[in-house]
């Protein structure tokens, strides 16, 4: 007779922010039910110090913790430390890498995303996605004199600013840095900070990093090559010493409008008899041949070649859907994520998805868009749990308010950065206006207006405008009569709209 299969009313896959938030919320809603959290990683990502800054803006820290800490906080959560080998959606069960089978009534897939690594398998190309890869990077950086960063997202931005004592060549395919987050004006504001020597003392980081014990690492059920850790948290570099071998503070050269064409190891490069460039030492960026030899050479599509100790691939992520697709006819979004509706349901019955793995396919609010960021992972995980609970009890549920307005607060180059609504005029066409206020080295304020209404904003620095602008975007009030006064620093804009 076949042994009974362990059943959980609710099974969540993924130990990142979306998965852990979903499991926690389900545990609160159903204290008598066992909630199974299946994760390939020996540590989970927990939200701590959560603070609702305004109606939609939120701040929190991300802490790595052993799964046992989650189980002690929620006695009805059982953490299963293993990757998923197969999902049989028709049978409502999953098989884990360690050979176990779990039956579910409702399943939420929160397996995150994988880095798009250029030249996978090359020992001189590092990707930074999880704590293990960040620590590997720190180890390599300690021996490095020069590295190249390829990519223009959040991790690339933070690396370019945080690395000290090492020459950094930063290759981006766009005209300006931080294209995902900023227009050319904001990029210029930040670039001046990047190119100046860092004088200010670093702000102490509140976030703690939990280091996995060596013994735990040895007992992992998956080989390191296959292991996909959940993404790094905000301030992920806070516990790392990002220092190269040299004594100078900061040295960055940006190559714009280019991508990697080819990578050569040292021996291969000698045979090719090509010329590489020395690191530009002056503001005029005079070009001279490099006399030094390097372990790896990177040829860019603009024709330039630089030698370096290693290359960091920070070119974005792809949804980690692969473990779940075999014999399961999921509908996928254009970006490869699992399509979800306004109740976080995938195209298969009783299967939900949240966080980086999913693609939001509902009709969005005019001032919201999906971006694979920490805040949305938490919001989606929380809302998915609410939807699963409502469906289990046969109750209707309204869309969560957090999807009314895109709102994200972060830090770049030691500046507070707030992004609201269509902050880069995404999808607005030519029919919009921009209003700007900039104090070099202090603050940058950009507002996106359409038909007299505020549609988005970028706030860099301590502007104290986020709550007022959030309300103006949500209310869609006609602001035509205020004109330039909206950004006049001598007028307290909050007084207008009390």
UniProtKB/Swiss-Prot annotation:
What the record notes about the co-factor is:
Binds 1 FAD per subunit.
Q: What cofactor(s) does the depicted protein rely on? A: FAD
Coiled-coil ranges per UniProt: none
Q: What's a GO cellular component annotated to this UniProt protein?
A: sarcomere
Listed EC numbers: 1.8.1.-
Pfam families referenced in this protein's UniProt entry, alphabetically = Pyr_redox_2, Rubredoxin_C
Where, per UniProt, does this protein localize? Nucleus; Cytoplasm; Cytoplasm, Myofibril, Sarcomere
Stretches that traverse the bilayer: none
Q: What is its main location?
A: nucleus
List modified residues, type N-acetylmethionine: 1
A single GO molecular-function term is: oxidoreductase activity
Enumerate the InterPro entries for this protein: FAD-bd_OxRdtase, FAD/NAD-bd_sf, FAD/NAD-binding_dom, FAD/NAD-linked_Rdtase_dimer_sf, Rubredoxin_C
- For this entry, list what GO says about its biological process: cellular response to oxidative stress
The domain of life is Eukaryota
Keyword terms: Acetylation, Cytoplasm, FAD, Flavoprotein, NADP, Nucleus, Oxidoreductase
PANTHER family, alphabetically? PYRIDINE NUCLEOTIDE-DISULFIDE OXIDOREDUCTASE DOMAIN-CONTAINING, PYRIDINE NUCLEOTIDE-DISULFIDE OXIDOREDUCTASE DOMAIN-CONTAINING PROTEIN 1
What family name appears in the similarity comment? Answer: Belongs to the class-I pyridine nucleotide-disulfide oxidoreductase family. PYROXD1 subfamily.
Its function?
Answer: Probable FAD-dependent oxidoreductase; involved in the cellular oxidative stress response. Required for normal sarcomere structure and muscle fiber integrity.
Q: What is the designated name of this protein?
A: Pyridine nucleotide-disulfide oxidoreductase domain-containing protein 1
Give the species this sequence originates from: Mus musculus
Gene from which the chain derives? Pyroxd1
């Amino acid at each position: 007779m076949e042994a009974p299969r362990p059943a959980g009313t609710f099974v969540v896959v993924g130990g990142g922010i979306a998965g852990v938030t979903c499991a926690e919320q389900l545990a609160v809603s159903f204290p008598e039910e066992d909630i199974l959290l299946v994760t390939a990683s020996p540590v989970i990502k927990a939200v701590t110090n959560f603070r609702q800054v305004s109606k939609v803006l939120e701040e929190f820290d991300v802490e790595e913790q052993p799964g046992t800490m989650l189980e002690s906080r929620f006695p009805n959560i059982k953490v299963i430390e293993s990757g998923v080998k197969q999902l049989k959606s028709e049978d409502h069960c999953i098989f884990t890498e360690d050979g176990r089978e779990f039956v579910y009534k409702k399943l939420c897939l929160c397996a995150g995303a994988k880095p798009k690594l250029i030249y996978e398998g090359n020992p001189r190309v590092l990707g930074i996605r999880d704590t293990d890869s960040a620590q590997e990077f720190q180890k390599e950086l300690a021996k490095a004199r020069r590295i190249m960063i390829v990519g223009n997202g959040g991790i690339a931005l933070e690396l370019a600013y945080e690395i000290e004592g090492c020459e950094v060549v930063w290759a981006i395919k766009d005209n300006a840095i931080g294209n995902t987050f900023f227009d050319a004006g904001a990029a210029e504001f930040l670039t001046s900070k990047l190119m100046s020597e860092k004088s200010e003392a670093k702000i102490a980081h509140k976030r703690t990093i939990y280091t996995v014990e060596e013994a735990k690492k040895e007992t992992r059920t998956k080989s390191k090559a296959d292991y996909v850790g959940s993404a790094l948290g905000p301030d992920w570099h806070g516990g790392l010493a990002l220092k190269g071998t040299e004594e100078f503070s900061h040295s960055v050269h940006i190559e714009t409008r280019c991508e990697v064409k080819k990578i050569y190891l040292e021996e291969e490069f000698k045979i090719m008899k090509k010329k590489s460039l020395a690191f530009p030492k002056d503001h005029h960026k005079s070009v001279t041949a490099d006399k030094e030899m390097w372990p790896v050479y990177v040829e860019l599509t603009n024709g330039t070649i630089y030698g370096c100790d290693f290359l960091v691939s920070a070119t974005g992520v792809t949804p980690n859907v692969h473990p779940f697709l075999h014999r399961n006819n999921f509908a996928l979004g254009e970006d490869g994520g699992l399509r979800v509706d306004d109740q976080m349901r995938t195209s298969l019955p009783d299967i939900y998805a949240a966080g980086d793995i999913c693609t939001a396919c509902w009709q969005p609010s005019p001032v919201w868009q999906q971006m694979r960021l920490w805040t949305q992972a938490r919001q989606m995980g929380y809302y998915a749990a609410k939807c699963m609970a409502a469906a289990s009890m046969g109750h209707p549920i309204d869309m969560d308010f957090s999807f009314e307005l895109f709102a994200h607060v972060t830090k770049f180059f030691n500046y507070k950065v707030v992004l609201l609504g269509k902050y880069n005029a995404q999808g607005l066409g030519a029919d919009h206006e921009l209003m700007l206020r900039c104090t070099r080295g202090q603050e940058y304020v950009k507002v996106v207006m359409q038909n007299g209404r505020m549609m988005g904003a970028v706030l860099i620095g301590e502007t104290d405008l986020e709550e007022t602008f959030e309300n103006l975007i949500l209310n869609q009030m006609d602001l035509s009569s205020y004109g330039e006064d909206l950004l006049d620093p001598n007028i307290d804009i909050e007084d207008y709209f009390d």
